[in-house]
Amino acid sequence: MIKQRTLKTPVKATGVGLHSGVKVEMTLRPAAPDSGIVFRRVDLEPPAELKADPYLVTDTRLCSMLESGAAKVSTVEHLMSALAGLGIDNLLVDLTGPEIPIMDGSSAPFVFLLQSAGIVEQNAAKRYVRITRPIEVRDGDKWARFVPHHGFKIEFTIDFKHPVFDKSGKTVTIDFADTAYTKEVARARTFGFMHEVEYLRNQGLALGGSLDNAIVMDEYRVLNQDGLRYDDEFVKHKVLDAIGDLYLLGHPIIGAFEAYKSGHALNNALLRELLQHREAWEFVSFEHDEDVPSAFLRLHPLAA
């Protein structure tokens, strides 16, 4: 059968929160089958646990924040994206602060950390959510939807009025049956504009942001000395975010995700809409490799 996965050994990283600017130590630990992804605020007394769950997402200004009682964990989407990309089902994430460290603004450092710790299979069947009917949410001209598809595919379009975006791709279609997440998506960094920085900081956001962990643009160009990592890095980062936001469902999705100008709020609204329509999805597990959509066999090679 296709089995659930966790880490072989614990692994640690330290960094600053993109929005809080606070230094945080994060420890990723193996977890039991069927426990899902659980964040633990070990700096609180008593320590607070927050499970990856679409209904715990409260603040979606520029990131996805989980909140339960007095405990919050923000900017979970890049780590969640790496976990989805590597097919990790169960994990404990111990944090000494309110935010996942931003690292370099992409999910590549998390992919490296997870692969360094080693990934192991567990004696329990992996449960997928298979989309059986289209589900869509809209907000003005923005929209996001799931449609049935035997695999995992994302089509995303962004629309920013800025000279840099005219040169970069605005639409990307990624079918994971023939594309590796770690190679084509994981290195895409978060991005922002100089003119927004002052406003964001007054709102208590982006306090840890810098050219080391984001693509920053003025009115005309990218300010980072090394330029872009992919020609279409902006829209690929939106794909990276979406993969992380959607993995808050707690299961890999068999289906296609299509979006126009979607962000954390709409991604979360789509998950909640899906859960409201029990007839639009089903749980599936696979006894044999040959029954699994090739997107998932390719997405999740087991580390040696």
From Swiss-Prot:
Pathway entry: Glycolipid biosynthesis; lipid IV(A) biosynthesis; lipid IV(A) from (3R)-3-hydroxytetradecanoyl-[acyl-carrier-protein] and UDP-N-acetyl-alpha-D-glucosamine: step 2/6
High-level lineage: Bacteria, Pseudomonadati, Pseudomonadota, Betaproteobacteria, Nitrosomonadales
Domain of life where this protein originates: Bacteria
Function per UniProt: Catalyzes the hydrolysis of UDP-3-O-myristoyl-N-acetylglucosamine to form UDP-3-O-myristoylglucosamine and acetate, the committed step in lipid A biosynthesis.
Active-site residues per Swiss-Prot or TrEMBL entry: 264 (proton donor)
Gene: lpxC
Record EC number: 3.5.1.108
Family: Belongs to the LpxC family.
The keyword Cell wall biogenesis/degradation belongs to this UniProt entry's keyword annotation: no
Coiled coil: none
Top class in the EC scheme: hydrolase
Signal sequence annotation: none
GO molecular function: metal ion binding; UDP-3-O-acyl-N-acetylglucosamine deacetylase activity
Transmembrane segment boundaries: none
Catalytic activity: a UDP-3-O-[(3R)-3-hydroxyacyl]-N-acetyl-alpha-D-glucosamine + H2O = a UDP-3-O-[(3R)-3-hydroxyacyl]-alpha-D-glucosamine + acetate
GO BP: lipid A biosynthetic process
PANTHER family registered for this protein in UniProt: UDP-3-O-ACYL-N-ACETYLGLUCOSAMINE DEACETYLASE 1, MITOCHONDRIAL-RELATED
A Pfam family of this chain: LpxC
Record's protein name: UDP-3-O-acyl-N-acetylglucosamine deacetylase
GO cellular component, one term: membrane
Cofactors named for this entry: Zn(2+)
Xref: HAMAP family: LpxC
